[in-house]
Structures are given as C-alpha cells and as structure tokens.
Amino acid sequence: MHSPPYLLSPAPNTPFPPAEYALREPNGLLAIGGDLTPQRLLAAYRNGIFPWFTEGQPPLWWSPDPRTVFRSDSIHLSRRFRRNLRTSTWTVRADTMFAAVIDACASTPRRGQDGTWITANMREAYLTLHQHSYAHSVEVFDGTMLVGGIYGVALGRMFFGESMFSTRNGASKIALASLAHFLHTHSAPLIDAQVENQHLLNLGAERWPRKDFLAYVRRLITQTDLPACWSVLFGEQLSRELV
C-alpha cells in the first residue's frame, strides 16, 4: 500500500483508505483527488473524512487527530450573551435559504485564509446534497434580513458541520445553539466541527481522539436518519427562546 496522502481514482465508488492512515503533518491529510459527487461525499462523511481545499487545488480529504466536536447538549453561551438574548427579536428557521447561507459562508473573510475553500464546485456539490435532504442549514433573521447561519450534512443521528457565518454580532452563535437544540431534541448527540479554533472552544467544543470520534460516527450513522423536513419541524423560532 502506498504512503499517505493516497491518490483517489476518478471513479466515485473508489473506497477511501482508513482515516487512521492520515498524515500527522499536515495534520489529517489523507487523500488527494477524486470528485465531489454525492456518492463520494457521503462515503467520506461515513468514514469520518471531509473535503477541504482551495480554488486551483485538487480535492483534498482530511481526518485530523484530535477531532473537534460539540455535544448537542453542551453549547456554551455566556451569561452576558444570554441576557442580551432576552430582548432579541431575531428569528431562526431551517432549510429556507440554504444557498444564501453557503454563499455567505463563502464570502466571509477568515483569519489566516486567502480566498475561500467553498469553490463553485463545492457549492454545487452541497446544493445537490441539500436537494436530496442530506445537507441542511439553520438561518438567523433580523426581520427579513439573513444575518447568520450554519450548514452541514446529516447522516443517521450524526451532524457534520461545514461552516457558519454572521453579519451581526452573535448571529452564528444563535445558529449553532439552535441547531444543537434541534439535534438534541431528536436524539442526535454530536456535531462534528472538524478543526479546532479558539472561538469554537469558547463555545464548548471538545477535542476528541480520532479513534473515539470514529467509533461514535460508525455507531450514529447506522441509526434512523433525522427527519428530512427540517423547515417544517423548525418553523419560525424566536432566538430568545434559547435562554
């Protein structure tokens, strides 16, 4: 067997190598190539692997160790933030503006990054997953204006977060907390947050050994899928209901 990173064939049914074979440096790089078909993307998530690359690069596939994870019942919102929420008139919905959420995530500047990893091909791939009820978004509104959101992929009782954004202070926190509450209510205990940063850790993210994360993924993806009709189940919630 070749040393990592492994070169994937263009055939979408080509299996991924085990995530445990990923490089230590750069942390988690496992494979290069392949494509972004729904079949390939879903196979990646089922094996604890995600795509992350920039314009001009071939698809790069990652499974870092440790893995950053949220428990859906343990999102941390500060006391001050919760106090401010009590007077908030913002509302939260799901799956009503998926394309707008992914576009806003793509256009949001990120510290230490030039450009965006959400390429045109990546965008189209996740729109296809959304059309097949695998990818979902949670959106925060100030009146009719979209001010924050998060999107990712749901398989079984596992949610794989991809990106979030806010144009108003705290809107992405509300999106994350609303997503977590929804998942916890539907017996989905984990949100994959992929790679750590201080902002995520401040919100309650934990660093798990990859082997523990993979064990949870293997168990949770075999459970009954979350309901597909997120927009109906979510309805329109007031953000202050999170307090």
Swiss-Prot record:
A Pfam family assignment: Leu_Phe_trans
Assigned EC number: 2.3.2.6
GO molecular-function term, one example from the UniProt record: leucyl-tRNA--protein transferase activity
Keyword vocabulary terms for this entry: Acyltransferase, Cytoplasm, Transferase
Keyword Lyase: no
Locations listed in the record: Cytoplasm
Cross-referenced InterPro entries: Acyl_CoA_acyltransferase, Leu/Phe-tRNA_Trfase, Leu/Phe-tRNA_Trfase_C, Leu/Phe-tRNA_Trfase_N
Record's catalysed reaction(s): N-terminal L-lysyl-[protein] + L-leucyl-tRNA(Leu) = N-terminal L-leucyl-L-lysyl-[protein] + tRNA(Leu) + H(+); N-terminal L-arginyl-[protein] + L-leucyl-tRNA(Leu) = N-terminal L-leucyl-L-arginyl-[protein] + tRNA(Leu) + H(+); L-phenylalanyl-tRNA(Phe) + an N-terminal L-alpha-aminoacyl-[protein] = an N-terminal L-phenylalanyl-L-alpha-aminoacyl-[protein] + tRNA(Phe)
Presence of the UniProt keyword Secreted in the record: no
Any one biological process term the GO annotation gives: protein catabolic process
Homology family: Belongs to the L/F-transferase family.
Name of protein: Leucyl/phenylalanyl-tRNA--protein transferase
The organism of origin for this protein: Xylella fastidiosa (strain 9a5c)
Gene that this polypeptide is encoded by: aat
